[in-house]
Regions:
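Flexible, polar/low-complexity N-terminal or interdomain linker segments that lie immediately upstream
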Residues: 2-52, 58-60
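N-terminal, post-signal-peptide region of Sec/Tat-exported proteins
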Residues: 47-83
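Active-site-adjacent betaalpha module
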Residues: 138
Length: 138
């Protein structure tokens, strides 16, 4: 058994390394200057008429979204000017993407804070958890 231990240990390490890589790609729980909200808290903001910005890829947006969400793909469309056309810096705004494994909404929230937006909400759980909760989608 001891002769096979190094090979077994190496196999286990190699087998678990993809899991470590996935864990490292988790979105942050908070964004400085923004408020992290749960799907339940986001629903209250939705019901209050707050602007939701979907920063996912166009194909994700086309496949399903929160009703009325504005699509500003973070890779091509999210600029200070484009966001300013959708929401004023003093007004609340919610950013979302594809949940914990997606960095787009945390990056967008940080960008908005940097541009002077004072009421930024970060829906870390994103569209998947919103949909799973049975909240409105289109």
């Amino acid at each position: 058994m001891t002769r096979h231990f190094p090979a077994l240990a190496a196999a286990l390490c190699l087998g678990l390394s993809p899991l470590a890589a996935v864990a490292a790609e988790q979105s942050p729980e908070t964004v400085e200057g923004a408020t992290t909200v749960s799907p339940e808290e986001a629903l209250a903001l939705f019901d209050a008429g707050v602007v939701f910005v979907d920063v996912r890829k166009p194909s994700d947006f086309d496949a399903g979204r929160i009703p009325g969400a504005v699509h500003l793909d973070i890779k091509t469309d999210l600029t200070e000017a484009n966001l300013g056309e959708v929401v004023a810096t003093a007004d609340p705004v919610v950013f979302y993407c594809n949940g914990h494994s997606c960095m787009r909404s945390s990056e967008a929230s940080a960008m908005a804070v940097g541009w002077g937006y004072s009421e930024v909400y970060y829906l870390r759980d994103g569209y998947p958890d919103w949909e799973a909760a049975g909240y409105p989608i289109e």
